[in-house]
């Protein structure tokens, strides 16, 4: 099976990486779909995020990285995946993700969204939080893959 894992990944966290690894173990292949949203100004370019994901997932068989804009279900159909993979950190994530899953299902009834609970030790992580800690010189080594930590240190120093 092929799973689509969409997100901005700005930056990739260890929580994201854990989901990618678990997705590969469960489904065999994970297509990491990096959102290119012209309405947002990301900390890292699309190419930088691609590189971060490629380096961080080099040990994983079955990972591919693509970019997309627009609807997730269009991306899923275009890339011939079987399901959409999402992670849940807390109940607030569940409510938000369930609404998106229902919307996706209304647009493409043949696509399922599978939720995986985030590992407890990653449940506090968010890309926004990581950037904030890095911006103020805090230790982020336990939050992101090494390649991302290096890029964040360069960005904020």
Curated annotation (Swiss-Prot):
Keywords: ATP-binding, Coenzyme A biosynthesis, Cytoplasm, Magnesium, Nucleotide-binding, Nucleotidyltransferase, Transferase. Its EC number is 2.7.7.3. It catalyses: (R)-4'-phosphopantetheine + ATP + H(+) = 3'-dephospho-CoA + diphosphate. GO terms for molecular function: ATP binding; pantetheine-phosphate adenylyltransferase activity. It holds the Pfam family CTP_transf_like. The keyword ATP-binding applies. Coiled coil: none annotated. The keyword Nucleotidyltransferase applies. It is an enzyme of class 2 (transferase). Gene3D superfamilies: HUPs. Substrate binds at residues 8, 40, 72, 86. The record marks 16 as: Transition state stabilizer. One of its GO terms (biological process) is coenzyme A biosynthetic process. Pathway: Cofactor biosynthesis; coenzyme A biosynthesis; CoA from (R)-pantothenate: step 4/5. Homohexamer. Reversibly transfers an adenylyl group from ATP to 4'-phosphopantetheine, yielding dephospho-CoA (dPCoA) and pyrophosphate. Belongs to the bacterial CoaD family. This is Phosphopantetheine adenylyltransferase. The lineage of its organism: Bacteria, Bacillati, Cyanobacteriota, Cyanophyceae, Synechococcales.
């Amino acid at each position: 099976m092929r799973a689509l894992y969409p997100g901005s990944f700005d930056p990739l966290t260890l929580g994201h990486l854990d989901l990618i690894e678990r997705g590969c173990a469960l489904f065999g292949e994970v297509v990491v779909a990096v959102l290119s949203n012209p309405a947002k100004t990301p900390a890292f370019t699309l190419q930088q995020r691609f590189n971060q994901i490629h380096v961080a997932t080099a040990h994983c068989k079955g990972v591919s990285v693509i970019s997309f804009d627009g609807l997730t279900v269009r991306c899923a159909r275009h890339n011939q995946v079987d399901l959409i993979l999402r992670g849940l950190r807390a109940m607030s994530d569940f409510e938000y993700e369930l609404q998106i899953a229902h919307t996706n299902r209304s647009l493409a009834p043949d696509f399922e969204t599978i939720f995986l609970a985030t590992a407890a030790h990653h449940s506090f992580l968010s890309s926004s939080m990581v950037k904030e800690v890095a911006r103020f010189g805090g230790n982020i080594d336990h939050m992101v893959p090494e390649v991302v930590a290096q890029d964040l240190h360069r960005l904020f120093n």
